[in-house]
Regions:
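Conserved alpha/beta-hydrolase "acid-adjacent" motif
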Residues: 85-91
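Residue in the alpha/beta-hydrolase core beta-strand immediately N-terminal to the catalytic nucleophile
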Residues: 12, 37-40
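Alpha/beta-hydrolase fold nucleophile elbow
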Residues: 6-16
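Catalytic histidine-centered segment of alpha/beta-hydrolase-like enzymes
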Residues: 110-120
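Short beta-strand/loop motif that positions the catalytic acidic residue
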Residues: 72, 77-80, 84
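Active-site nucleophile loop of the alpha/beta-hydrolase fold
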Residues: 39-49
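Conserved serine/cysteine hydrolase catalytic core
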Residues: 61-75, 122
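Gly/Ala-rich beta-loop-alpha elbow adjacent to hydrolase catalytic centers
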Residues: 14-24
Length: 126
């Protein structure tokens, strides 16, 4: 599907939960076809190869390789809620630590961001 992208359109990528770790792994190991305007990691699972709480499958990555992401993205947004009962809040803090040019958006009562409306995310596209 990447081949079908309009080469003149701005690209923003959004990964939620396991989708977040998928994008982190992909972008830390590969160079995307062009510059990414914004990367949004919403309640992303951190790479826990030893964890029984999260089966990250083949999505585990080397944290030191995350620096490759920063050069491919104009903006990096990490979205986390302190009351997330599926992914630990600390997972998002780890991404923030390893992605120094990222912006972290912290909420207190959004859980795992399963609501049908996410106005704050939408506003970043305006």
């Amino acid at each position: 599907y990447i081949d079908l992208l309009d080469i003149n359109a701005e690209i923003s990528l959004i990964g939620h939960s396991l989708g977040g770790i998928f994008l982190a792994k992909y972008l830390s190991e590969n160079t995307f076809i062009r510059q990414i305007r914004a990367l949004h990691l919403i309640a992303p699972v951190w790479s826990h190869p030893e964890s029984i709480l999260h089966n990250t499958g083949n999505f585990s990555f080397e944290a030191k390789n995350l620096k490759k992401i920063s050069s491919q993205c104009d903006e990096i947004h990490i979205w986390a809620s302190r009351d997330d009962d599926i992914v630990n809040f600390e997972d998002s803090e780890k991404y923030f630590e390893y992605l120094p040019k990222s912006e972290m958006h912290i909420f207190g009562h959004r859980g795992h961001f399963l609501q049908s409306h996410f106005v704050e995310l939408f506003q970043t596209f305006l």
